[in-house]
């Protein structure tokens, strides 16, 4: 899948950004001032005054600004997104192009029909499995060794220190020390 350019993203996000109530006048003014002050090659003083003209409606000024940036090029669109992130971060995270990018990243990683989440069972299922594993480990650890009941358990536990952290492996190795001669 090809990368989506910032200009393409701005074309996709323009209807969302210009809809009523998305950006306040103060946020638009801050974005314009940032583009004008830090990047005067993007917005000259004359352009900044035009886009901050209070006689025009906010929607018209924003449409003009976005059109100007789309015509200016990729770097200008990228700086607009940076200014939008700084001055309107909650809105930046809701942009349609960001959702499209996140969904495309997930589909590239997935086999196609699986979801992006690791598990949808929740924390109760995790705690249940953790409790079950801890209970079984405690049962094996505390029960007196009876070779007739669990003949292969000590062999399995003998290989688990390779996988488990060194702090836990000390306890497993101490458990195995009395029966290593039987391997």
UniProtKB/Swiss-Prot annotation:
Main location: endoplasmic reticulum
Keywords of the record: Disulfide bond, Endoplasmic reticulum, Membrane, Mitochondrion, Transmembrane, Transmembrane helix
Disulphide linkage map: 7-77
CDD domains documented for this protein: CARD_BinCARD_like (cd13785)
GO cellular component: endoplasmic reticulum membrane; mitochondrial membrane; mitochondrion
Record membrane topology: Single-pass membrane protein
Gene3D superfamilies (UniProt xref): Death Domain, Fas
Record localization: Endoplasmic reticulum membrane; Mitochondrion membrane
PANTHER family given in the database record: CASPASE RECRUITMENT DOMAIN-CONTAINING PROTEIN 19
Function of the protein: Plays a role in inhibiting the effects of BCL10-induced activation of NF-kappa-B. May inhibit the phosphorylation of BCL10 in a CARD-dependent manner.
This protein's name: Caspase recruitment domain-containing protein 19
Organism name: Bos taurus
Gene behind the chain: CARD19
């Amino acid at each position: 899948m090809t990368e989506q350019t910032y200009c393409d993203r701005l074309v996709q996000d323009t209807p969302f950004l210009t809809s009523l109530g998305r950006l306040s006048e103060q946020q638009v003014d801050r974005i314009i001032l940032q583009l004008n002050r830090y990047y005067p090659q993007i917005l000259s003083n004359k352009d900044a005054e035009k886009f901050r003209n209070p006689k025009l409606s906010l929607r018209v000024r924003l449409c003009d600004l976005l059109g100007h940036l789309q015509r200016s090029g990729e770097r200008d669109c990228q700086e607009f997104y940076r200014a939008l992130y700084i001055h309107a971060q909650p809105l930046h995270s809701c942009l349609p192009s960001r959702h499209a990018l996140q969904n495309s990243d997930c589909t590239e990683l997935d086999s196609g029909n699986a979801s992006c989440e690791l598990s949808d069972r929740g924390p109760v299922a995790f705690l249940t499995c953790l409790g079950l594993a801890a209970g079984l480990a405690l049962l094996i650890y505390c029960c007196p060794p009876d070779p007739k009941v669990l003949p292969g358990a000590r062999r399995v536990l003998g290989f688990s220190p390779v996988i488990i952290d060194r702090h836990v492996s000390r306890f497993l190795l101490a458990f195995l020390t009395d029966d290593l001669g039987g391997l």
